A protein has these predicted regions:
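Adenosyl-5′-phosphate
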Residues: 1, 234-237, 379-386, 405, ...
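Cysteine-centered catalytic environments shared across enzyme families
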Residues: 1-358
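Short, motif-level signal for alpha-helix interfacial/capping segments enriched in acidic residues
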Residues: 9-12, 367, 422-427
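Short, well-ordered loop/turn and helix-capping segments at boundaries between secondary-structure elements
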Residues: 10, 90, 109, 289, ...
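Generic recognition of stable, solvent-exposed alpha-helical segments in well-folded globular domains
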Residues: 19, 98, 247, 251, ...
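Short, charged, surface-exposed loops that flank catalytic or proteolytic processing sites
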Residues: 115, 131, 364, 462-471
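ATP-dependent adenylate-handling ligase core
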Residues: 249, 316-374, 400-409, 431-432, ...
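Short acidic/histidine-rich active-site segments
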Residues: 382-392, 398
């Protein structure tokens, strides 16, 4: 994981502006503690804080084209970089072994087209199609800023789902600023906001524009493809789709295996986050399968590190820890169980909110143990981990999905959840780990895997009544896991580290925030007024760190049950008067639901 800061549309380069960029970059140095770099030229400044994962020796950034006419700052990993390099053999002289350098070659190819300049004047559609084509060639997680010094133009882009964070801001002088975390922009801009996933910003046609589009964004395409009978209820739809299940299981198995294998590229020690739930257990088991050799050369040489290390965190006696140990013993990882106390968690919350830059209740709850775990992982020399984020959004794994009335409601909710993931679990996983200089990779959100998983018949993902959630994933990988884990009910990470963690947070915040404060919450916080005392408590800390309106607007604040969107609250009458993100809020489904 790295950190980037860039300033564009500079009218005059000055020593003061360079120092401003350096100060901004220093605020995110935790993301990239291995090296710092900066470029100042033309109308741009690009600064970079590096965490070296691939090509530690020569991959320092910013990266330059062979003739120095283009410069690039990237936070991310391009998993198909070897294929792109092969395509440019003899046509582009790469300067480093960095996977991210392929972005420069793709940009140069695009810009070298004889008709590209005319596209700028032909109309937005033609220009948009050409830039989108370039960005679609990348399979990876990324946020980048590219400056073309020859033409004095720039291109900014973010990965399809928003695994890598990025923010964009504008100052009173017309400058455009981007940074990996909002703390670098706080106080520097008149306005800033999250840079949207799957979008780009091209200076010759300003504004964020979506390049990542898929047929599965719309349920109508899925309904037509699979001839789903929308007149039927969930149970009947599921019965109709049963003949397709076997093929779907194999497709998911093969696609996820390929995703994990792609994401194991690394020149430094790596591990896996193993919570003991289904998703992290599947990722860990598949990673263990390929970890003994280097995926970069097709498994022809042994891995630099002989054993895969797995990590779990929780309070003593937490439900996840025993299951994580069981999985680790089953698949053969070197397992590390990290215990923390409730007081240690409470003491960390102020720092956690500073690093993750949110006041969302679920995110703060889950980020705290992850933040504590990341510190231990880094102390052991691990710089990259694979994690299971995204599976619940893709496959409808949250317990409230049991209440989905039909395939249309189910599929549209998964699309909504994926579209908002950059504000929640992607943010948590990235920033909690990056606080200690660790990169997190998420195979369930791999672009090629998503085309398979989101393109499958949504009926096969449904879990009406007592049907177990994520059945297709369980069947695809049951042979790699202990049976009691393969068929274990979904447990949210913030619950699984220990129920007493959540219960104590509720008690502490309930006593720390008075009824009078809650009554006047909208006066103190007119933007997204806190909906409960726990959110008020976190919001107060957030406002101390980041007092601007832009910061407040960057965080979502919507009613939710068990991590649902607001739209899904109509699925069950019991959701109507609830606002609790815990899975225990789904009565009749969670085995230890609230009484």
């Amino acid at each position: 994981m790295c950190g980037i800061v860039s300033i564009f549309n500079i009218q005059e380069q000055t020593p003061e502006l360079r120092q401003q960029a350096l100060r901004m970059s220093q605020k995110i140095r935790h993301r990239g503690p291995d090296w710092s770099g900066i470029y100042c030229g033309g109308s741009a400044i690009l600064a970079h804080e590096r965490l070296s994962i691939v090509d530690p020796e020569s991959g320092r950034q910013p990266l330059f084209a062979p003739d120095k006419k283009q410069v690039l700052a990237v936070n991310g990993e391009i998993y198909n970089h070897q294929n792109i390099r092969a395509r440019f053999a003899g046509k582009y002289q790469y300067q480093t072994g960095s996977d991210c350098e392929v972005i420069l070659s793709l940009y140069r190819e695009m810009r070298a087209d004889s008709d590209f300049d005319t596209l700028i004047y032909k109309g937005e559609d033609a220009l948009h199609a050409r830039i989108s084509k370039m960005l679609e060639e990348l399979n990876g997680i990324f946020a980048f800023a590219l400056y073309d010094a020859e033409r004095d133009e720039f291109l900014i882009a973010r990965d399809p789902i928003g695994v890598i964070p990025l923010y964009i801001g504008y100052d009173k002088d017309g400058k455009v600023l981007v940074a990996s975390e909002l703390k670098a922009l706080e106080g520097q801009c008149d306005h800033y906001e999250p840079f949207l996933p799957g979008h780009y910003y091209y200076s010759k046609n300003p504004g964020m524009k979506r390049y990542y589009t898929r047929d599965w964004f719309e349920y109508a395409a899925m309904q037509k493809k699979y001839q789903i009978d929308d007149k039927k209820k969930a149970e009947a739809q599921l019965k109709d789709a049963e003949p397709q299940e076997k093929a779907a299981v194999k497709e998911i198995h093969d696609a996820l295996e390929a995703s994990v294998k792609r994401q194991l590229m690394s020149d430094v020690p790596y591990g896996v986050l193993l919570s003991g739930g289904l998703d992290s257990s599947v990722i860990s088991a598949v990673a263990e399968k390929f970890s003994s050799t280097r995926v970069e050369n097709g498994g022809e040489t042994k891995a630099y590190w002989p054993r895969l290390h797995s990590f779990a965190v929780g309070l003593k006696g937490a439900p996840d820890l025993a299951k994580a140990r069981l999985v680790a013993d089953h698949i053969g990882t070197v397992h590390h169980e990290i215990n923390y106390t409730i007081q240690e968690g409470l003491d960390a919350i102020r720092d956690v909110i500073y690093f993750i830059e949110t006041y969302d209740v679920t995110t703060v709850r889950a980020s705290t143990p992850m933040y504590l775990l990341a510190r231990v992982i880094r102390s052991m020399g691990i710089k990259m981990v694979l994690s299971g984020e995204g599976a619940d959004e893709v496959f409808g794994g949250y317990l409230y999905f049991h209440k989905a009335p039909d395939a249309k409601a189910f599929h549209e909710e998964t699309v909504r959840k994926l579209g908002k993931l950059y504000l929640y679990d992607c943010l948590r996983a990235n920033k909690s780990l990056a606080a200690w200089g660790i990169e997190g990779r998420v195979p369930f959100l791999d672009k090629e895997f998503l085309d398979v998983a989101m393109g499958m018949n949504p009926v096969l993902k449904m879990c009406p009544d007592k049907t177990i959630e994520k059945k297709v994933v369980r069947e695809a990988f049951a042979d790699l896991l202990p049976e009691e884990v393969a068929w274990r009910q979904k447990e949210q990470f913030s619950d699984g580290v220990g129920y007493s963690w959540i219960d104590t947070l509720k008690q502490i915040t309930a006593s720390a925030v008075s009824d009078e404060q809650m009554a006047h919450a909208a006066e103190r916080f007119p933007i997204n007024p806190p909906q409960n005392k726990e959110e008020y408590y976190y919001r107060s800390i957030f406002a101390e760190h980041f007092p601007s309106d832009s910061a407040a607007k960057s965080v979502p604040s919507v009613p939710s049950v068990a991590c649902s969107t607001a739209e899904a609250l109509v699925w069950d009458a019991s959701f109507k008067n609830q606002n609790d993100p815990s899975g225990r809020a789904v009565a009749g489904v969670h085995e230890q639901a609230y009484k």
